[in-house]
């Protein structure tokens, strides 16, 4: 069974797949944050127009940008997301038992749901603020 037959989220457990996301990564040889080291730390490259060096942990979904050539990806990951369970996994993906993998992936799924829920809550609060402001402006016209 090849990596391409895995669900997309599970493909990210494979370091080589994470490495492949680092297209146009600005830090290559002679740097601490090479694509290989970034992938080892759980990161994928997800650049935007304004953040060309944006990287996100596929597991805890922590996003970091503003990388410097001497930044150590594992240390930066620990500093900004010390509770990420991916950092404590001592086995390669292929060495995990099914039970270990499913427990780990349950944590990843919970992280994803928490991130999405927080994002939706912020969107809701911003919309509520705009609506409240519009209502107050209408009330002031009376």
Curated annotation (Swiss-Prot):
The modification Phosphoserine is found at residue 20. Its main location: cytoplasm. It comes from the Eukaryota. Keywords: Acetylation, Apoptosis, Cell cycle, Cell division, Centromere, Chromosome, Chromosome partition, Cytoplasm, Cytoskeleton, Kinetochore, Metal-binding, Microtubule, Mitosis, Nucleus, Phosphoprotein, Protease inhibitor, Repressor, Thiol protease inhibitor, Transcription, Transcription regulation, Ubl conjugation, Zinc. GO terms for biological process: apoptotic process; cell division; chromosome segregation; establishment of chromosome localization; G2/M transition of mitotic cell cycle; mitotic cytokinesis; mitotic spindle assembly checkpoint signaling; mitotic spindle organization. The keyword Coiled coil does not apply. The modification Phosphothreonine is found at residues 34, 48, 117. The keyword Ligase does not apply. Monomer or homodimer. Exists as a homodimer in the apo state and as a monomer in the CPC-bound state. The monomer protects cells against apoptosis more efficiently than the dimer. Only the dimeric form is capable of enhancing tubulin stability in cells. When phosphorylated, interacts with LAMTOR5/HBXIP; the resulting complex binds pro-CASP9, as well as active CASP9, but much less efficiently. This is Baculoviral IAP repeat-containing protein 5. The lineage of its organism: Eukaryota, Metazoa, Chordata, Craniata, Vertebrata.
């Amino acid at each position: 069974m090849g990596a391409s037959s895995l669900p997309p989220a599970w493909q990210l457990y494979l370091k080589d797949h994470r490495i492949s996301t680092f297209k146009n990564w600005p830090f290559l040889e002679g740097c601490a944050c090479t694509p290989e080291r970034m992938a080892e730390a759980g990161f994928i490259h997800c650049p935007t127009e304004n953040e060309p060096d944006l990287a996100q942990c596929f597991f805890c979904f922590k996003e970091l940008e503003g990388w410097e050539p001497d930044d150590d990806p594992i240390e930066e990951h620990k500093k900004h997301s010390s509770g990420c369970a991916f950092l404590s996994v001592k086995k390669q993906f292929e060495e995990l038992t099914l039970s270990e993998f499913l427990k780990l992936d349950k944590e990843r799924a919970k992280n994803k749901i928490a991130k999405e829920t927080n994002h939706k809550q912020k969107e809701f609060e911003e919309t509520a603020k705009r609506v409240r402001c519009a209502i107050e402006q209408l009330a002031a016209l009376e």
